[in-house]
Amino acid sequence: MSEHKIKPVTIQDDKYRFDAFKNGEVLFGKKGRLPAMGWNSWNAFGSGNNEELTKAMADKMIELGLDKYGYIYVVLDDGCYASKRVDGHLASDAEKFPSGFMAMSDYIHSKGLKYGMYNDVGDRLCSGLEVGTVGYEEIDCQDYIKWKIDYIKVDNCYNIWDNATFSCPKNAKYTFAPDIKGIKLVKVSKEGMKSSNLEMGVTKYSISDGKITGERAYIEGGYATGIGTFDGTSPDASPVSELSSEVHFNVNVSEDAEYDLYVDARCRTREGSGGWLQVAVGTSYYYDDLLVDSVDTEICTDKPIRIKLSKGENVIRLMNHRRQENTLTSYAKIQECFEKLAPEKDILFSICEWGKTQPHNWGYKVGDSWRILNDITFQVGSDGDPGTVSWEGAYTTSVTAQYNKAVIMDEFAGLDKGWNDPDMLVIGMNGMTDTMNKTHMTMWCMLNSPLMLGMDLRRVEKNDDIYKIITNEDLIALNQDTLGVQAKRIFTSKGVKPDTTYLRDNDRVDVLAKPLSDGSVALSFINVSLGFREDRISISPELIREYIGGKMKDADNFVNASKYKVKNLWTKEESVVEANEVAEKGFNVSGLAATDNLTLRIIPM
């Protein structure tokens, strides 16, 4: 991938800035959706999906009655397009989809299903096809509207402003600030002349005088480096930590005045060290550009940046949040075009940037869901091969790597925001036992994750083991409950704070609690490990209220119930338990087989 010579768009509106990420303002799209349910071609067929296979999947969805359970989207993933644009427009691969996308849309809609497609905010798709949306947003949205799509998944490969997957490594100049050694301030007199001294003669500040915020940056060799945002495609950083870093200098002045700021910096083009600098005093921005035209140098800049300081204490912020801001802007551009061209259309927008820029912080502004990590598997299937996945494995490619991150991200999800997406379901792929499949389904339902099937549905028959798992109405009801609350982990056998501690050691049992719209609570005991766990765990109504009471329909009614109706959502066994027995024993489990779960719906009576 070649290095781009142009620069990212100038941010004219502060609503796209990092400082606005927590303000709750939705920029584009509709809220109030429950997690999407359907089928996506990628895990089943990779880039080998075609018209015949897609029609067969749509037919099978109806034959199996999956639409009656809520699986309504049929999504064409990567590999469906021609390798290049035709007269500036997207076109179908003539061999794979000879009838074209409109015919595919008509076929899927004729089944009463909804039609989804795929693209990328980069200049290519992840498969390398040179048909990414960047620069073609309005043309592409026109085509998608013409094809009557109901859903779009948008990837993040070949991002021209990030050193993301398949992108130019030198794009790090856009995603990280220069390494900072210090600053110098020169006061500008009212006549426009510069004074070499501030009050008390102090004009220079070394990095030791500053303060690093967040967990990404650190001091090395007298420089602050890593001024930017953690790459969230890796599982190394907790999603509930402060993932972006700035360098702050507190400066006290005796009067309002203008100053020229000189930044003693080192510009590079590698992960953690870049060339793009943002300068603000408080929330007022004064600079947002490459610090020098030629990066990858060891020189310090003598470029003055004019700023205003107010009488008293000022916080000068040196930072680069463009990794997040550029990505938000790219996704927003697509949504803006949809809204401009067809505001009446209801198109579900699935952000697939793999957690790269921490989209749980900004994704709600433009999307209905956002991927939180790299792919759950890179061993996808093909026609005749179901593909392979691991329960646990190296780095990100496993069921538990996705779960371990998503399980502490509940506060970022909701009907007013959207949903954390730990990738598509891998039920039916090689490497998964029946027990794993059940627990995987439980996890995704409790976490309010999108339920997108990723298997060759021709391998499923009514009432076989796979069918019974993916059509478990009691589990689906948790995911689609109208209260729209992701479960919270309220206990873990690791003995740490359960709701926010990022755990990657799978030798444990977790307990998740999910409030439901009828006043009941779903409680799931999950053995995350590959071995039998002997733990005896008891959960009281009071503990449930402590963690999720603020989101329950009526927490006091739940705690003070005289009895409880308890249903096992896998065995379907039901019992009524008196309050005094619950007070003595709690809702409990004694031992769980490897990768197994006990999931209960508890109804106060």
List PLM regions with ranges.
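N-terminal module-boundary/linker segments of secreted carbohydrate-active enzymes
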Residues: S2-E51, E336-E339, I526
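Aromatic- and carboxylate-lined catalytic core of secreted/periplasmic carbohydrate-active enzymes
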Residues: G221, G226, F230-A237, E411-D423, ...
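Extracytoplasmic
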Residues: C168-E325, R533, I544-K563, G586, ...
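Aromatic-lined carbohydrate-binding/catalytic grooves of carbohydrate-active enzymes
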Residues: L53-N163
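Glycan-recognition surfaces
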Residues: N326-A332, E336-D456
